[in-house]
Curated annotation (Swiss-Prot):
HAMAP family cross-referenced by the UniProt entry: PIMT
Compartments it resides in: Cytoplasm
UniProt-recorded name of the protein: Protein-L-isoaspartate O-methyltransferase
Active-site positions on this chain: S62
Underlying gene: pcm
């Protein structure tokens, strides 16, 4: 366990601080959350390396830098309500909860949803609520959300997510006309206006659903 703690510290210093991650809350959360528990046991030795890892069912856990970058982009503050689309193994949700945000997370794959639910409960992340559903529809029953973070790439920003974003609010989402190659888009809603900004190229798994790619 001590080695894993050292690995987390090395990850923060070498992969995050050197690449523009400066938010103290994000850095503290990345130091704290045991990423190795959110990857397959056979891959735990690689948990803190600078690349994504498969988690089964054609899905991945994003590389640490991308998790930190997206967390920083949404300007996290304790008590904000955040909707995550694409629970995966639950790591991004844990990072958000570690920073004190109230997390609502949606996953379409039943097995991943169940595994993430059990692990987050074991680790006592009580501020995380999970739902099994089509993430492109959001979670309308609990809307609006101060922040929305999407961990899969679709052809466009789903309209339901724009509608469920609070005003003011921030969303970060990979968007691209071709699968697996997108731009990281920041959507800001302010005073009834919606403004988009690109943060550069990224490569995410497909956002599958009614307002995404067909499965």
């Amino acid at each position: 366990m001590l080695d894993m703690k050292r690995n987390r510290e090395r990850m923060v210093k070498q992969q995050l601080e050197t690449r523009g991650i400066t938010d103290p809350a994000v850095l503290a959360a990345m130091r704290s959350v045991p990423r190795h528990l959110f990857v397959q046991e056979a891959l735990r030795a690689q948990a803190y390396e600078d690349h994504p890892l498969p988690i089964g069912y054609g899905q991945t856990i994003s590389q640490p830098f991308i998790v930190a970058l997206m967390s920083q982009i949404i300007e996290p503050q304790p008590g904000l309500r955040v909707l995550e689309i694409g629970t995966g193994s639950g790591y991004q949700a844990a990072v958000l909860a570690e920073m004190g945000l109230d997390v609502y997370t949606v996953e379409r794959i039943r097995e991943l949803h169940a595994a993430a639910r059990d692990l987050l409960r074991t680790l006592k992340y009580r501020k995380v609520r999970l739902k099994l559903d089509d993430g492109t529809l959001g979670w309308p029953e609990a809307a609006p959300y101060d922040r929305i973070l999407v961990t899969a790439g679709g052809p466009e920003v789903p309209l339901p997510l724009i509608e469920q974003l609070a005003d003011p609010g921030i969303m970060v989402i990979p968007v691209g006309a071709s699968k697996r190659m997108q731009e990281l888009v920041v959507v800001r809603k302010q005073g009834g206006r919606v403004v988009r900004e690109s943060k550069g190229g990224v490569a995410f798994v497909d956002l599958v659903g009614t307002h995404g790619w067909r499965g």
